[in-house]
């Protein structure tokens, strides 16, 4: 299994590197083409390609650093670097988008000539580059991690931006209606802004060690207490995420077991199977928790047990 995981990460790394080189190269080409042709739509699409290149780079770094083992100085490893990079990336993208919006508004008041043919040629080349990058990220039978899938979505969004730039170039060539250029540049920038804002919120949430969006502390507490009879209460839960891995610490108030280690393993296996939590630090308690933090959960647990017993009693009564 370890060998297969290494092979998968190697395949992901090669695909990401190839897609990054293609995207970064054509991003530079689009910037040059946009400046020479005077097309703001090309510059906006280049800004979107910058988001793709940054996303691909972050994904590539994540794959590379994920293979490094934690050490005494960095006990969680280096996965938090990818979150920090995503935060900086999102802030940069928002600034770029604001600049494109400002330039587009200025173009409405002071229209600039746009060279349609160079704009069209560069936009077509950018579209082809995005198609190749998108194919690379989807090619192969290996399991692709969330970073690779997210990067593929970025490239798909940029592919649509290239289509917009081509449409603007064709309209300018046949009608000479240059306002279409800033209009489409604003539409492409909106795609970038949406991605950047979502990335900014997600990275801030993770940097502040917020609960992973796919997990619910309340649901987890209820599930564990209802499905493992020896567990009376779960409290003082701390749930956060490092890279793609959820981490957890909790206190479990339990009925004194015959085998402490066996019960501990059952709780850990339940968390792994139902919540994909591989690393959980569990403090077992054999007495009632008097902390205000846990009284609410204890009352809810007793109510759930009472309701369950009442339901069983009613079912038994109906059988008679």
Curated annotation (Swiss-Prot):
<keyword id="KW-0864">Zinc transport</keyword>
<feature type="transmembrane region" description="Helical">
    <location>
        <begin position="16"/>
        <end position="36"/>
    </location>
</feature>
<dbReference type="GO" id="GO:0005886">
    <property type="term" value="C:plasma membrane"/>
</dbReference>
<feature type="transmembrane region" description="Helical">
    <location>
        <begin position="43"/>
        <end position="63"/>
    </location>
</feature>
<dbReference type="Pfam" id="PF01545">
    <property type="entry name" value="Cation_efflux"/>
</dbReference>
<keyword id="KW-0862">Zinc</keyword>
<keyword id="KW-0472">Membrane</keyword>
<dbReference type="InterPro" id="IPR023500">
    <property type="entry name" value="Zn_transptr_ZitB"/>
</dbReference>
<keyword id="KW-0406">Ion transport</keyword>
<dbReference type="GO" id="GO:0005385">
    <property type="term" value="F:zinc ion transmembrane transporter activity"/>
</dbReference>
<dbReference type="InterPro" id="IPR027469">
    <property type="entry name" value="Cation_efflux_TMD_sf"/>
</dbReference>
<comment type="function">
    <text>Involved in zinc efflux across the cytoplasmic membrane, thus reducing zinc accumulation in the cytoplasm and rendering bacteria more resistant to zinc. It may contribute to zinc homeostasis at low concentrations of zinc.</text>
</comment>
<dbReference type="InterPro" id="IPR050681">
    <property type="entry name" value="CDF/SLC30A"/>
</dbReference>
<keyword id="KW-1133">Transmembrane helix</keyword>
<feature type="transmembrane region" description="Helical">
    <location>
        <begin position="117"/>
        <end position="137"/>
    </location>
</feature>
<feature type="transmembrane region" description="Helical">
    <location>
        <begin position="153"/>
        <end position="173"/>
    </location>
</feature>
<feature type="transmembrane region" description="Helical">
    <location>
        <begin position="85"/>
        <end position="105"/>
    </location>
</feature>
<feature type="transmembrane region" description="Helical">
    <location>
        <begin position="180"/>
        <end position="200"/>
    </location>
</feature>
<comment type="similarity">
    <text>Belongs to the cation diffusion facilitator (CDF) transporter (TC 2.A.4) family. SLC30A subfamily.</text>
</comment>
<keyword id="KW-0812">Transmembrane</keyword>
<keyword id="KW-0813">Transport</keyword>
<dbReference type="InterPro" id="IPR036837">
    <property type="entry name" value="Cation_efflux_CTD_sf"/>
</dbReference>
<dbReference type="InterPro" id="IPR002524">
    <property type="entry name" value="Cation_efflux"/>
</dbReference>
<keyword id="KW-1003">Cell membrane</keyword>
<protein>
    <recommendedName>
        <fullName>Zinc transporter ZitB</fullName>
    </recommendedName>
</protein>
<keyword id="KW-0997">Cell inner membrane</keyword>
